[in-house]
């Protein structure tokens, strides 16, 4: 709580009168993210709302839903699904006078491959509602939260219990204490299991028959997954920071393999008890926490939990965390096979270490004849695996292919994303592709959120709790709180350091923004007149990196974010810096890079980073993106794509794309992560091009290093801008 109070003087988020033609803003008062108690729901209330009998707007909720309960009971069971596999399920029920609340209550459900609760070394259990003492099944909400990490209701479940909701949390098959083996993450079978659990919920005497789902990251993705199975009674979902197109966001949508996800695969294998990690590793460290997944109530001696682990150890796919990595593409399987052969091992742990470390991979290629050429020739195509092209009823899914089913289910969706999340675009694509009731909030936060002493992260936890409650009150209890009568979109505009303010729009993208072109000019100047027949060159630095704690690493548990010296990073490639901005403006949407270039190698990776430099010389990262030249052919997206560039990336397109050479310039176009940022008078923009982001994407150093030449007259940066209204 003290951390929040320290931040209170920083919080101010008043909306100024909009310019003509701009969307009318929602009501925003002076933001007070330093709540006085965990159940405070007046974070963004305007002064008159604080005095009113009832109030309902983003971050402001009172008088519509009365808090009635101050305690809860947690019980844990095994629930069999249709094929008899037993899944571990926790049920949290509000208590009145020490007894579960009478009558049938609406249920909020959370479901994923993550642990539903954790047994700590002292015998206590960490839950979504704080911590419970050894053997304890009932607790005051206040006391459980106070015993938990941070003493806060970060998941908002305490608030839901207080307002008369039952909370159910389940572990997917093959994870945690659940039995069974996995058919890949986000599988069709996992969707059916989720449907079976909802059917079980609705058969219970305490359930009203109306269910909503909440959660972020995988827990957000699993909401879309379960909704695609159209379970009876699932009315609304609240998915946060959920990826949409796995190939594009997490796999290889630009042709460049994302390797940071190896840390996530390795971590989950350790938690599932099928791998042990490596001491001293940054990507796959040994687990020294001495924690375990919580047992169900009847499993007094832990034998059932251990039996579930033994079952998954018998499955080759479960034992090897690389399975999800390789099933998406034969080329990925060949990548792993080639590196394993060069190392003389089939064990996943050392292969992961080499894949993650560009120097280690380069050293291995120097020792293994022909390895560099074989790895360079690999292409990661969109149509290499069925999951990237169509819905899978059994195996792993690319959720974008399920969007039509989700819309057809009729479920209401509140998409919740952050401008500093790794999957920012995905949240916007979920909104664009849903054809049912929907709402969208894009905040200033990361994937976690877990940045210490950062107002933007505090806002994420505070606002999420309130918006969850407003959403489920409307859909599960029929409370007429107006959540669908407000503007459909809330979005934060980032300012200086951890500052931001809020805007609204009737739909995404907001109106009034027009593309502004910034030429890549001579003398590394961004903007101004184009440079006819001029070029700029640089040599690939394969160690160029935004570090090991980027927005991407934060998404897999390697946060908080911490970027390196961005001026030093700019010197590892080629950069263009604008003149100081005269009149301020807002930039909201996806920056787009257009390049005309030649290369000394037939294929090459291009990474772009967009930054803001204030009058004092402080550099702020805004966005980044990348493209492998062999994936430059554009094609139709299989979903609504917000008018952005879309790399075809299918095998036929790759085969039809000519290689790069040093004489014939080729056109590359790609988008960077969307953002919403205000630039003030005196600020400058900088665009940085490099040949690698060595700790985030697979980097295969070439010998000699690639030489790039950018043809300036046909190269530019396009930004969606409008005049600042603050």
Question: What is the predicted role of each segment?
Answer:
Residues 415-417:
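Short beta-strand/loop motif that positions the catalytic acidic residue
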Residues 57-103, 581-583:
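N-terminal cap/lid segment of alpha/beta-hydrolase-fold proteins
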Residues 25-56, 62, 117-119, 125-157, ...:
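Accessory cap/linker subdomain of secreted extracellular hydrolases
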Residues 220-231, 595:
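Short glycine-enriched nucleophile-adjacent loop
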Residues 205-217:
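Alpha/beta-hydrolase fold nucleophile elbow
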Residues 25-48, 304-363, 457-726:
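C-terminal, loop-rich substrate-recognition/catalytic regions characterized by aromatic stacking residues
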Residues 98-202, 452-456, 614-615, 623, ...:
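Cap/lid segment of the alpha/beta-hydrolase catalytic domain
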Residues 425-439:
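Active-site-adjacent alpha-helix of alpha/beta-hydrolase-fold enzymes
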